[in-house]
């Protein structure tokens, strides 16, 4: 695939303005029924090293098909600013996606979708930029609060609510007794559909298998730079 050029803001204030504008383009409607090939995205970075981004092409029936890795030099990275992570990681993700042998039908991203202070986490940002359905699966809570306590058993889910009560996604227990995940739609996916899709994915550990494999690849690639 050939992603369109990604704008690089000159400073955080410009990034904030762009983020607010792009958030208005997010569509929280759509189905992932019938989607078969997705790209799972994960990134890893250590001070003094390039940022490593991995795009793993995954067939929901056959498993992993292809892994593409991109390195972005540290000096080329957008400054680290909480809530603006997508401007730091997205250029490397787009480079990795461009190296895949075929375009995915949807994106599964390690990070937030609309569960973000301005409604545009990395999954939403990439989804809008590429006009692809996208789902964010985060390991940590960035924004919002659980509607109720989350049961310990596998498959349990409670809604994640914004401070004003709007639903943002779900707090989801992928395995009994493990820490929860925070699932939110990115773009062209409804809230319930995002959770439904993540529940469909094979999950042997805490992370859905496509994201777990992408995470392992990113870690290996970063370690190889030492």
From Swiss-Prot:
Biological process per Gene Ontology, one example term: DNA repair
Principal cellular location given in the protein's record: cytoplasm
Keywords (A to Z) from UniProt: Cytoplasm, DNA damage, DNA repair, Endonuclease, Hydrolase, Magnesium, Metal-binding, Nuclease
GO function term, MF aspect, one: deoxyribonuclease V activity
Residues of the signal peptide: none
Localisation: Cytoplasm
Protein family per UniProt: Belongs to the endonuclease V family.
Protein name (record): Endonuclease V
The organism's taxonomic lineage, starting at the top: Bacteria, Thermotogati, Deinococcota, Deinococci, Thermales
